[in-house]
């Protein structure tokens, strides 16, 4: 399996992280914490129901930094951003918990989820069942499995662990081979297509459009990365894609929730402006 260099470094660090964390909190203790966590909020169902109505099902991301862009947002208060997103019409939230490469934190997920009623995905690089159980203990409702970071056996193992603890799974692919592996290995309804090439970090919305015909109708295609303006949203919607994961476009805006409205619900922005007038 060829893994992109940046991803390879991140994955190697994740194995170290699991060893460090499980030395501090044992697997048995983590399982106990997971059992005591708030009930899952139904991440997949929320997206599916919204998309069925042909309404934008937006997973709004809370992300301070990235390896390719550095710090994206200086004024970073996860609870405030979460509330802004909920008011703006987000269906779900995505919170980065990776510390070393994205300046995320477990606490950010907890703070964001406590501030709203929306389901939340733990956005991190899952390589071990411990992290899945940890995600549930933190209160996450869904986890991300990145096909290019996992072999099929590990992918299936992580998905099985997620099911055991009541977590939904969003599987992420960025080419046809990965899509084939994901569909063969997992039965999750959520298939994310990352428009960012993990080898080059270049972004092309054609990635989603190219893979779309190969995604079965009983799965929900979610386009990730590169949605920056109304034209991008409309391009997806005319191709019957109503589920989006967007981070950077919102994080760079002064008011993330208002930017979400501008991109996905422009009619509501007009109404708000008229009310203010």
From Swiss-Prot:
The keyword Amino-acid biosynthesis applies. One of its GO terms (molecular function) is indole-3-glycerol-phosphate synthase activity. Keywords: Amino-acid biosynthesis, Aromatic amino acid biosynthesis, Decarboxylase, Lyase, Tryptophan biosynthesis. The keyword Lyase applies. Gene3D superfamilies: Aldolase class I (3.20.20.70). GO terms for biological process: L-tryptophan biosynthetic process. PANTHER family: INDOLE-3-GLYCEROL-PHOSPHATE SYNTHASE, TRYPTOPHAN BIOSYNTHESIS PROTEIN. Belongs to the TrpC family. This is Indole-3-glycerol phosphate synthase. It comes from Pseudomonas putida (strain W619). The lineage of its organism: Bacteria, Pseudomonadati, Pseudomonadota, Gammaproteobacteria, Pseudomonadales.
